[in-house]
């Protein structure tokens, strides 16, 4: 018992001694203290490795001198604006002359510019740059047009000449419709399309078309009675669209080599138009395309495949239709449809394109001046009364096989025809063929 009491007393003395000296049994792990601003390690940029010196960006030296004068080293790239556009200072470079006699580049931002507004058109709008109580001026232009996402959507009236800005890719429909002040429009390179009725019933006299133009809407120059000339020859259009020049007073229309079709009534009632060369790649001429036009002569390509009915109906001044170019044999149904040249009393020469295979009825009904006619070798069918009631006297048929005729009575040529000359080896075939046998006594071999 005595030994237990001694042991407990010893333990109590040991605990009291430890508390006085604060001796920890195990030292705690301290959390690292946060870095101060001066002690933070520098972050290494990507791409650097340990031991390589870091490249620091060059900084402009702080200029202690006073700015005395501003000069424009380079104007902004954009000095031509349209209605509603925001200020664009890209490319603008200013130089400052300082009191130490040295020049330094000066940074400029929109806050330094006064006088800018694109809410109204301005031929010469002066803008002022204000920096450290020094000023310099430059001029911009605000055109009387509005452009949205590359589309010309509005043109203010009261201007006789408009130059489109370089960012226009399309002209919206009816933009110039009814504008009786406009005389000239210069279209920008980069423009690819013009919407329908864009110049309908306007006073436009001249249009400069870009080489990038590819698409035309319908009725673009309908009722433009002051337009004298349309040069589309260097464009990329493939279709001359319906009604594009109806009632326009164009005297000359130049078409591009890319053109493939002339649509319905494209040049109808163009009374002052004198001459047209149809480009070699054109395969299609639509219904009444040249109806009541003033053309005197027309050249058709030998590769054409379709001339729709009444294409040249009632062209009273038309005297000559000639052909040119290589022959295309790609259209087995290539045809000149009915009544194409009816109402052309002065027509004295008619050449049929050598690609044609079918001749429609009544092609030159009523004409008395076409006396000689050659039917090309590819023609395989001649329809009812194709050349009846005309002044045709001499016919040359190149095909060895007689072209087919409709069943029943055939009035392919007038009763007054004097000779039908065919290949020598085919004379008998023609004399006995249906329809042709009616003219047997006038059929003879070509010399």
Where are these regions (language model features)?
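Serine/threonine-rich, repeat-prone extracellular segments and beta-strand-based repeat modules
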Residues: 78, 102-138
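Solvent-exposed, low-complexity, repeat-rich "mucin-like" stalks and linkers
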Residues: 66-104
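Sec-dependent bacterial lipoprotein signal peptides
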Residues: 1-16
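Short, solvent-exposed loop/edge segments of extracellular or virion-exposed proteins
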Residues: 36-40, 71-82, 151-161, 325-328
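Bacterial Sec-dependent N-terminal signal peptides
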Residues: 15-66, 134-143, 147
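Consensus positions within tandem repeat domains that build extended binding/scaffold surfaces
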Residues: 173-175, 195-198, 217-220, 241-244, ...
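Structural signature of tandem-repeat unit edges
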Residues: 80, 156-170, 180-193, 202-215, ...
């Amino acid at each position: 018992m005595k030994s237990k009491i001694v042991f407990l007393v010893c333990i109590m003395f040991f605990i009291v001694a430890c508390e006085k000296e604060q001796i920890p049994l195990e030292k705690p792990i301290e959390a690292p203290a946060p870095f101060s601003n001066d002690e933070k390690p520098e972050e290494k940029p990507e791409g650097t490795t340990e031991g390589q010196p870091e490249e620091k960006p060059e900084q402009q030296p702080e200029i202690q001198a006073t700015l005395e004068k501003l000069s424009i080293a380079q104007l902004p790239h954009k000095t031509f604006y349209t209605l509603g556009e925001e200020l664009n200072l890209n490319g603008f470079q200013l130089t400052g002359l300082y009191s130490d006699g040295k020049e330094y580049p000066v940074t400029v931002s929109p806050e330094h510019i006064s006088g800018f507004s694109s809410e109204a058109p301005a031929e010469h709008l002066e803008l002022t740059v204000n920096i450290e109580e020094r000023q310099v001026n430059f001029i911009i232009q605000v055109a009387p047009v509005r452009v949205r996402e590359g589309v010309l959507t509005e043109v203010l009236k009261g201007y006789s000449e408009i130059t489109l800005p370089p960012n226009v890719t399309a002209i919206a429909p009816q933009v110039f419709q009814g504008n009786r002040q406009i005389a000239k429009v210069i279209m920008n390179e980069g423009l690819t399309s013009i919407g329908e009725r864009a110049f309908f019933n306007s006073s436009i006299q001249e249009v400069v078309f870009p080489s990038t133009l590819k698409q035309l809407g319908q009725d673009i120059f309908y009722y433009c009675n002051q337009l004298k000339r349309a040069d589309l020859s260097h464009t990329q259009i493939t279709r001359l669209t319906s009604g594009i020049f109806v009632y326009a007073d164009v005297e000359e229309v130049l078409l591009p080599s890319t053109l493939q079709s002339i649509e319905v009534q494209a040049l109808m009632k163009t009374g002052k138009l004198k001459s047209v060369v149809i480009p070699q790649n054109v395969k299609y001429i639509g219904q009444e395309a040249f109806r009541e036009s003033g053309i005197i002569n027309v050249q058709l390509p030998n590769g054409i495949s379709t001339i729709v009915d009444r294409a040249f109906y009632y062209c009273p001044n038309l005297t000559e239709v000639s052909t040119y170019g290589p022959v295309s044999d790609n259209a087995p149904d290539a045809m000149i449809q009915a009544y194409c040249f009816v109402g052309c009393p002065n027509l004295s020469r008619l050449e049929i394109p050598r690609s044609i295979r079918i001749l429609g009825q009544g092609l030159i009904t009523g004409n008395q001046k076409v006396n000689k006619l050659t039917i090309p070798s590819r023609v395989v069918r001649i329809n009812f009364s194709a050349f009846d009631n005309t002044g045709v006297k001499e016919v040359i048929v190149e095909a060895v096989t007689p072209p087919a005729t409709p069943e029943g009575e055939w009035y392919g040529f007038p009763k007054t025809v004097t000779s039908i000359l065919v290949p020598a080896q085919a004379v008998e075939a023609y004399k006995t063929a249906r329809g042709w046998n009616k003219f047997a006594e006038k059929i003879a071999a070509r010399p």
